[in-house]
Design a protein with these regions (language model features):
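NTP/phosphate- and nucleic-acid-binding module
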Residues: 1-216
């Protein structure tokens, strides 16, 4: 979509979102109920930015959206979920995109966003995506193990691989920056979290069968 025509700085940030059916060949040993499956629906967005300032602003907006969605679902930050700043490993160039300066800058930017929000978070090394660091919203399952519900990620790789550029106000081509965000995450996974959270007794508006009339 982005490459369908030349893009101006006036069009950025550009938010492209979809609810898509995806398939992932997860190993059988890690498949877990609705939490980790091979076929799932993902609410995903790619936000294309012109500069670091736009990226930080979009990350803040994405976290606001995630907090709003969580509140609507009846989830409370600090009690039902928490933020994790997922960092890369500069020494592992086979696993992570190799650009130490970019990693340092992006991780610092995400850390600043979390600090400016005055919210509690923890940092986890070697938990980033191969293409960049991320902020993960972690929820604890009934077995006490944490898993990721929502996420906001920096992506160093996509702009380079697809040669994504825009025309700045001086008429010069410049590379874009990309943020991934998922507002409600994987539908199957959040359904599993909510079923555990409410012990199967979902709120009326969320229950698939809201009222049943039984003859006596």
């Amino acid at each position: 979509l982005y490459l369908s025509k030349p893009r101006s700085y006036r069009e950025l940030p550009m938010r492209i979102a979809e609810l898509a059916k995806l398939y992932r060949f997860e190993l059988s040993g890690v498949l877990t109920g609705l939490i980790r499956v091979r076929s799932f629906c993902l609410a995903d967005a790619h936000i294309i930015c012109a500069d670091e300032g736009q990226m930080k602003s979009e990350v803040k907006g994405a976290l606001d959206l995630i907090d709003h969605v969580a509140k609507v679902l009846g989830l409370e930050m600090g009690k039902n979920y928490r933020y994790r700043l997922s960092l890369g490993d500069r020494t592992n160039t086979k696993k992570y995109y190799e650009d130490p300066a970019a990693w340092e800058k992006a991780e610092g930017s995400l850390r600043e966003v979390l600090q400016e929000r005055n919210c509690e978070f923890f940092e986890a090394a070697d938990e980033a995506a191969f293409y960049g660091p991320k902020i993960d919203v972690q929820m604890t399952k009934i077995n006490g193990v944490e898993d990721t519900a929502f996420t906001v990620q920096y992506d160093f790789v996509m702009p380079k691989r697809f040669d994504l550029k825009y025309i700045d106000r001086d008429g010069q081509e410049k590379p874009v920056l990309v943020v991934h965000r998922s507002s409600i995450g994987c539908i199957e996974r959040i359904a599993a979290f909510l079923l555990e959270h409410y012990n199967g007794n979902l709120p009326l508006w969320l229950a698939p069968v809201q009222v049943a009339i039984l003859p006596v």
